[in-house]
Amino acid sequence: MELKLLNDQGQAASNVAAPDTIFGRDYNEALIHQVVVAYQANARSGNRKQKDREEVHHTTKKPWRQKGTGRARAGMSSSPLWRGGGRIFPNSPDENFSHKVNKKMYRAGVCSILSQLAREGRLSVIENLSVEAPKTKLLSQKLKGMGLDSVLVITDSLDENLLLASRNLPNVLICEPRHADPVSLVFYKKILITKLALAKIEEMLA
């Protein structure tokens, strides 16, 4: 598999060889779905909380006598059938949403995503991406000149100017290879990888 190698102006200069074991895999939609869902589920904090009939504010006094009123039987105001009553099966903050995915499956899913991106022409390699100063305008103009509006940039190391310049751009994310997660790879329209970062990705996923 050969990927387009861009120069600093975003123009295709040449091609760079990439291993087929990472960028030449078949598209496995079921595996990609499993990996993405598992990653999102594992990121959940689990902070939902609802009260059961014991925790809501209530009194144990019987609202009316058992018989003779013609109304339905009622025991106390915390009944889940009543307005303001407790939930029957409340959500708890200690609920575990995590999904287990084996390392081999995770790597295979990421490789399948990268392979599909390469086939669609959405993945490119660049010699280096940098800005002279931590200015959002400079980075925005550079990316606009390359025709990139929604892009994930994977660099071998985080450049402070580049990181600060990208913070106010909603559709731009700068990260290192170890932080390139499957959700980000699927979300952004274009993926830009520096040449040194490509070597690290090959080492990680080999």
Swiss-Prot record:
Single Gene Ontology MF annotation: structural constituent of ribosome
Subunit and partners: Part of the 50S ribosomal subunit.
Region entry Disordered, spans: 43-78
Biological classification of the source: Bacteria, Pseudomonadati, Pseudomonadota, Betaproteobacteria, Burkholderiales
UniProt cross-references to Pfam families, sorted A to Z: Ribosomal_L4
Residue stretches in coiled coil: none
Function, in words: One of the primary rRNA binding proteins, this protein initially binds near the 5'-end of the 23S rRNA. It is important during the early stages of 50S assembly. It makes multiple contacts with different domains of the 23S rRNA in the assembled 50S subunit and ribosome. Forms part of the polypeptide exit tunnel.
Basic residues bias locations: 59-70
NCBIfam families: rplD_bact (TIGR03953)
Cellular component aspect of the GO annotation: ribonucleoprotein complex; ribosome
Protein name, entry field: Large ribosomal subunit protein uL4
GO biological process: translation
